[in-house]
Amino acid sequence: MAKCTKKVGGIVSKYRTHHGASLWKMVKEIEISQHTKYTCSFCGKTKMKRRAVKIRHCNSCMKTVAGSAWTYNTTSAVMVKSAIRRLKELKDQ
């Protein structure tokens, strides 16, 4: 019997023949991270979904937040949040 071709690529199979393998491997990481559901920082449920570029919406508590283009949190946003939390703790003491 003849062998079938192996299906690879998944979400980025649309870029397969026109672009190189290194490019679609990078795009695969980006597209997987942008389409995953994230944990909502308000209600704690995994319902935060991408609506548009930089806009995420929680289907549980109906909050809409702005973030990074591909991920929910940017590294600079995480640093700012931790600095604000640290300053609030110092103020309370």
From Swiss-Prot:
Transmembrane segments: none annotated. It comes from the Eukaryota. A zinc finger (C4-type) spans 40-61. Keywords: Metal-binding, Ribonucleoprotein, Ribosomal protein, Zinc, Zinc-finger. Disulfide bonds: none annotated. GO terms for molecular function: structural constituent of ribosome; zinc ion binding. One of its GO terms (biological process) is translation. It holds the Pfam family Ribosomal_L37ae. One of its GO terms (cellular component) is cytosolic large ribosomal subunit. Belongs to the eukaryotic ribosomal protein eL43 family. This is Putative ribosomal protein eL43-like.
